[in-house]
Amino acid sequence: GAISALGGLGSLPGKLGIIGGGVMGEALLSCLLSKRMYAPDSILVSDLSHERRQLLAEQYDIQTTHSNREVIEHSDVIVLSIKPQVFDSVARDFAGIVVGAPHLVISILAGVSLSRLEQAVPGWPVIRAMPNTPATVGCGMTAIAVGNRAITENVEVAQQLFSAVGDVVQVAEPLLDGVTGLSGSGPAYVAIVIESLADG
């Protein structure tokens, strides 16, 4: 499908949907656009705030919607960039979606496990990512943990996506949760990188 064929150098396949246009969602959006990994017309962002949607649409020339379901139905890669406490309501937006070509779902929600994500998402590959705070200025480190349904191409897409905001390291999920409480703290990321180098 669209996901398995990586586009030309620097560009990513298909349509990108971001659910949640807050600080992290916007940081990713702005880095992806500035590095030309996606064209503005390939990105759809959902946010409940009308003001936020208007600001993102005007500033980045992208499409926005209040409907998470619209993002889910029209995107090849879906980034969940919402607060963990609203995950259950967003999970309901996935209910009953007919599985066509599998969409890749990437979650940057702290503390929401791969197994919970996989239960919410019908048969699609899931990857968790934990960008640290400097990622908002494009010089961060993102740790990713890969779900059971994700294949190599999915991992490559996630790595390419987060390379827009800095370095990417793949870790086991417990390591990801180990830094959740310290999200944004440099030492925790150094510890992860050292441990992943030791493992690998």
Task: For each feature predicted by the language model, list its residue ranges.
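NAD(P)+-binding Rossmann beta1-loop-alpha1 motif at the extreme N-terminus of oxidoreductases
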Residues: 1-66, 70-73, 139-140
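A short, flexible low-complexity segment enriched in Lys/Arg and Gly/Pro that occurs
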Residues: 1-3, 105-110, 115, 157-165
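Short, well-ordered alpha-helices that flank and scaffold nucleotide-derived cofactor binding pockets
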Residues: 26, 30-34, 58, 92, ...
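Conserved beta-strand termini and adjacent loop/short-helix elements that scaffold enzyme active sites
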Residues: 46, 65-67, 129, 171-174
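Rossmann-like NAD(P)(H) cofactor-binding subdomain of soluble oxidoreductases
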Residues: 50, 60, 68-80, 84-144
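Internal alpha-helical scaffold of NAD(P)-dependent oxidoreductase catalytic cores
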Residues: 116-125, 141-179, 189-200
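Catalytic, metal-anchored helix/loop core of enzyme active sites in primary metabolism
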Residues: 182
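Aromatic-residue-lined binding/catalytic grooves and analogous aromatic/hydrophobic interfacial grooves
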Residues: 186
